[in-house]
């Protein structure tokens, strides 16, 4: 493991010190290579499963002369990557001097193609959404970003989509993290491809966002597919339509790397940020192995943190050290858990640590305030 002697001395001397592995950060940002398993969903087209009451719902209170950002707000469009309202992202891009609009259709997680499939099948709407975003923020140009590694998929992607240049991103997973500095230097703003499609529909068809694009996949269903579904659909309803197996042992909603396990399929509904629903037959055991200190989790962290020490500090409840080790910078990609030979739940423990650190800091602040009042 890395030598901490100088850093610990700095800490004991009362200095604030960052424990990120800057010497290894470039290596870490290369990411890890994952099997994609995007077929047959990616090449199978998009199936539409919508409730009658949520199909083509008109935008409330739409006024003649509303600008693009206002329409995005009234349409309730949510960016599928960030979970934030699209109008806020557009407004921020407009105020920051954005020069380039980027349509994110990366889909770098295994099984998931719920951004790429709409980008390929609904290219006209995507391009229209890109042009609207450019107009809204005053950008000069635009491009789309698509993951280079598509595994065994027969889908071919040209140099442009409807005239918009395509940048094939070749970094490992998580690919988006490797692009942050590049986007910052270019003054580029990134928007989810699906959000841009919904923007085109809102402006041209005057309809609100009531649907989301989702990939249903895994060996626990008869076939995988990309869907456009209304936001009132449950995970169980969608999985059963595609042959949910009785042997399914685990269902994950979100993504294969960043998703969360769910148990109540019929009460878990899709949201505007749901990217996939995966059903797996594999039996996931809690082996309770002991960490062997190999450091593989540190090697792959895309933001240069030390999952090894963060995991140890969470287990020990050492909250002050969690802050010193920049736990708040964790992006939740799950690569640390993926490479762990002991099958430890490193990523989920770090997520728990982030939440407990907030509670710890709030309690500490409240205690200090009470002491000041008594003084």
Q: Where are the language model's segments positioned?
A:
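Short alpha-helical segments in extracytoplasmic peptidoglycan/chitin-binding modules
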Residues: 1, 26, 232, 237-241, ...
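N-terminal, Lys/Arg-enriched amphipathic/low-complexity engagement segments
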Residues: 2-27, 32
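Residues forming the flavin
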Residues: 24-41, 158-162
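Acidic low-complexity segments
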Residues: 32-93, 112
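Hydrophobic alpha-helical positions that pack around
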Residues: 50, 65, 75-82, 90-95, ...
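Flexible, glycine/charged-enriched surface loops at secondary-structure junctions
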Residues: 139-145, 211, 246-254, 321-324, ...
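Active-site gating/interface segments in enzymes
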Residues: 172-174, 240, 244-293
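Ferredoxin-type iron-sulfur electron-transfer modules in oxidoreductases and energy-metabolism complexes
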Residues: 277-288, 298, 302-375
């Amino acid at each position: 493991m890395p030598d901490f002697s100088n850093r610990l001395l700095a800490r004991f001397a009362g200095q604030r010190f960052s424990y990120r592995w800057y010497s290894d950060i470039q290596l870490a940002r290369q990411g890890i290579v994952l099997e994609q398993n995007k077929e047959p969903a990616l090449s199978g087209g998009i199936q539409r499963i919508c409730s009658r009451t949520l199909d083509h719902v008109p935008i409330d209170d739409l006024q003649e002369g509303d600008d693009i950002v206002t329409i995005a707000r009234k349409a309730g469009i949510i960016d599928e990557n960030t979970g934030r309202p699209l109008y806020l992202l557009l407004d921020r891009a407009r105020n920051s001097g954005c020069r380039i609009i980027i349509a994110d259709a990366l889909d770098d997680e295994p099984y998931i193609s719920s951004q790429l499939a709409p980008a390929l099948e609904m290219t006209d709407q995507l391009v229209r959404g890109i042009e609207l975003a450019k107009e809204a923020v005053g950008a000069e140009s635009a491009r789309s970003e698509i993951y280079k590694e598509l595994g065994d998929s027969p889908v071919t992607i040209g140099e442009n989509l409807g005239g918009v240049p395509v940048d094939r991103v070749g970094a490992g997973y998580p690919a988006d993290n490797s692009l942050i500095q590049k986007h910052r230097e270019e003054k580029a703003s990134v928007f989810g491809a699906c959000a841009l499609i919904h923007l085109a529909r809102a402006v041209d068809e005057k309809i609100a966002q009531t649907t989301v694009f989702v990939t249903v996949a895994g060996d626990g269903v008869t076939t995988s597919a990309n869907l456009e579904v209304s936001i009132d659909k449950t995970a169980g309803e969608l999985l059963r339509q595609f042959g949910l197996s009785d042997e399914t042992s685990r269902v994950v909603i979100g993504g294969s790397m960043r998703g969360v396990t769910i148990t109540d399929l019929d009460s878990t509904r899709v949201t505007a940020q749901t990217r996939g629903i995966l059903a797996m037959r594999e039996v996931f055991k809690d082996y309770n192995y002991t960490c062997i200190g190999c450091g593989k989790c540190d090697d792959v962290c895309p933001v240069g943190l030390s999952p090894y020490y963060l995991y140890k500090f969470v287990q020990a409840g050492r909250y002050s050290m969690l802050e010193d080790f920049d736990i708040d910078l964790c992006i939740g990609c799950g690569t640390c858990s993926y490479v762990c030979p002991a099958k430890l739940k490193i990523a989920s423990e770090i997520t728990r640590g982030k939440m407990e650190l907030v509670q710890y800091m709030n309690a500490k602040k409240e205690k200090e305030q009470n002491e000041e009042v008594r003084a």
